Amino acid sequence: MNGRFQVLPDAIQVNLEHGETPADIVPVLSDAARLARERQLQNLLVVSGLGDPATAEAVSTALQEMQALGAPPARIAFVAYMFPQYSVYHFAESYAQKFGIEAKVHVSIRDAKDWLGVRQETPQTLPRG
């Protein structure tokens, strides 16, 4: 799975695309949470792209792993353009509450950034890993 990270002023953005199995998203989202913790950022912006194989089970596992890291992000904005992914990330909104994470699914990156309060500056792109 391709998971490209961008460091935004107030969040880590991860683009999920070209996955083979739902489990592919788990290490990508865990790495994003780890990077956010290292950078002392409280927000994740997860953008569902072409070939995002997310399922409710995989997202649940990813949220559990983020919690196990000891410092889950305070807020996660999911951006989904296709109904199957929108449905999965809509489920994640309520499931994330179990871990004290506020989550919301959006249909545009701009709306997601507004919800997170991310300032609009040039992001820094980082390779995953």
Predicted regions and their residues:
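Amphipathic, Lys/Arg-enriched alpha-helical "gate/interface" segment within cytosolic domains
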Residues: M1-G129
